[in-house]
Amino acid sequence: MATLIDADLLTAIVTPFDENNKIDFSSLEKLVNYLIGQGCNGFVVGGTTGETPTLTHDEKIDLYKHFSQFVNKRVPIIAGTGSNNTAETIAFTNEVAQIEGIDYALIVVPPYNKPNQRSMVAHFSAINDATKIPFLIYNIPGRTGVKMEKETIVQLSRLDNIKGIKQCASLEEMEYIIENKDPDFQVFTGEDTQALTARLLGANGVISVASHIYANQMRRMYDSLYEGNYPLAAKIQRWLTPRMQALFMYPSPAPVKAVLNAQGLNVGGCRLPLVELNDEEKITLAQRLGLDDNALMQKLPLDLGKELEDD
């Protein structure tokens, strides 16, 4: 299996849909190859950005099988398998574990039920004991309605099958987790704007939405950090931050899909209950991305960071 040891820039990839609202596997394969070529070294498939709540069980299995074939063991794959039903999560995670090339599962803190910390420990401990694939916790309180506290994360980091976390919370909480976790437990920020700072603090990297659009710049940012060119790494993050924020100004993944479509990567629209951006929203998004007003209604180049190339 491919491991996350050397993965620092992972894309939480969109699910392309065709004109009949079916998964567009041809466009997905094109996008996978493009992103790997731009410097992404891992993927989350079937996550929030992949609109997983709108996918049926069979669609998810089909998606994961195709995705594994497209990646062909070049980089690690993390597949979303979580739900707010523990037994269902265990069953689906074990089913996904049978798909060759799926390296890890991503299991979200249960939404809607509003479990307390003791309930979260029981939920993830049960999954740890009953599943056959290593997995990461997905802590995203803005979407689930509850937050796994840093002490709970550290406690769960000791369990054999829990290999890491996608953490969407404050940097102070991340510091605590990194300082106190099991040494083999890997920490990824799920907040694009934290990509550089989290890495400096000792996180393994970022699971990113913005890397669909800015993978080349994010790879350069990390490489600059590793080379000791801290001013350049910081400059790239400062350039990226307002653009990263803009990609969430409307319900995600509608903004990133609008940009990808303008770039010719043809990922289609969103499934209900989300809708694609209208023209007014595209203009506002383009402005926030530093583009011409009508840029998202025309053909857009793949490289949107040429102004950084002279540094």
Swiss-Prot record:
Residues with site note (Part of a proton relay during catalysis): T48, Y112
InterPro entries: Aldolase_TIM, DapA, DapA-like, Schiff_base-form_aldolases_AS
Chain ranges passing through the membrane: none
Keyword set includes Nucleotide-binding: no
Binding site for pyruvate: T49, I207
EC number: 4.3.3.7
Reactions mediated catalytically: L-aspartate 4-semialdehyde + pyruvate = (2S,4S)-4-hydroxy-2,3,4,5-tetrahydrodipicolinate + H2O + H(+)
Subcellular location per the Swiss-Prot or TrEMBL entry: Cytoplasm
GO CC term, one of those recorded: cytosol
Domain of life: Bacteria
Keywords: Amino-acid biosynthesis, Cytoplasm, Diaminopimelate biosynthesis, Lyase, Lysine biosynthesis, Schiff base
GO molecular function: 4-hydroxy-tetrahydrodipicolinate synthase activity
One BP term from GO: diaminopimelate biosynthetic process
UniProt-annotated catalytic positions: Y138 (proton donor/acceptor), K166 (schiff-base intermediate with substrate)
Signal sequence, renumbered to the chain: none
Chief site of localization: cytoplasm
Associated pathway: Amino-acid biosynthesis; L-lysine biosynthesis via DAP pathway; (S)-tetrahydrodipicolinate from L-aspartate: step 3/4
Function field: Catalyzes the condensation of (S)-aspartate-beta-semialdehyde [(S)-ASA] and pyruvate to 4-hydroxy-tetrahydrodipicolinate (HTPA).
Protein family membership: Belongs to the DapA family.
Subunit composition and interactions: Homotetramer; dimer of dimers.
Protein name, as recorded: 4-hydroxy-tetrahydrodipicolinate synthase
